[in-house]
Amino acid sequence: MHAHWQRHYRDTDWLLVSHAGTPVGRLYLSRWAREHRIVDIAFLPEHRGQGLGAALLQDLLDEAARAGKSLFIHVEKMNPAMSLYRRLGFVKESEEGVYDLMRWSA
């Protein structure tokens, strides 16, 4: 899977998300001239619902705000994390099949 992301998203940073020294998830993030985009974010099932995703997203929002850029993410319409994105201020920019493109602006 990682090889796919490296091949198709060469300008994307890959980050291993850790908590208390334990790997808990991954993040693929593109920082483009006009925007930042979360290409992929995932947490291991046993580490979901503990506020780790919210904390990571808040760090990304803070970074985007400092850079004066919007932050985008494609989210499956039925993804339980959709409520988290909305709570953090993301709004639907467009619909693309089973995905909504969500945008956060400073």
Model feature map: region roles:
Residues 35, 64-76:
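Conserved GNAT acetyl-CoA-binding A-motif
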Residues 88-89, 104-106:
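Structural recognition of alpha->loop->beta junctions
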Residues 44, 48, 72-82, 98-105:
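Conserved beta-strand-loop-alpha-helix junction that forms the acyl-donor binding cleft
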Residues 49-62, 82-87:
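Conserved acetyl-CoA-binding loop-helix of GNAT-fold acetyltransferases
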Residues 1-40, 44-45, 57-63, 92-97:
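Acetyl-CoA-dependent GNAT
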Residues 52, 69, 90:
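Short phosphate-binding/catalytic loops that engage adenosine nucleotides
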